[in-house]
Amino acid sequence: MCIRDRTKAEIEDLVCEHSLIYSRGQLGFTEFLPNERVAMRPVRQRLVRTHPVTHAKSLFLASHIGTIVGWPRPEAMAFIRDLMEHATQPRFVYVHRWTRHDLVMWDNRTTMHRVRRFDDLHVVRDMRRTTTRSEGPTAAQG
């Protein structure tokens, strides 16, 4: 992903807390029942992941990162924002232009993805998801 070697060394061991409560809160959804808060408690994940098959390193970035463990929140969020801006530069982004009978597959372990709006009143779409066994969280839970 073309990150400077110094930055790579600095981020190698960082752990982020991923929280659906955080990402929903960014959109204004802040009312959660106690059992929902328990079900959506933060999950710790290493920021840098090594793919178990290819051994390629990638950043595990998502809109639901709420902090970096051990960092003051403002600095953590500014740093994550900078990494997200870097990762979503046009040179790193694939945009699929759908045509009839297309099949698109990706490996969630190394891909940031986002759905875009589409005209569901006039366009027929068949979406299916397959999930194989996952490695689960990549950092000790605190």
Regions found by a protein language model. Name each.
Residues 3-103, 108-142:
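Non-heme Fe(II) oxygenase catalytic core, chiefly the N-lobe of the double-stranded beta-helix
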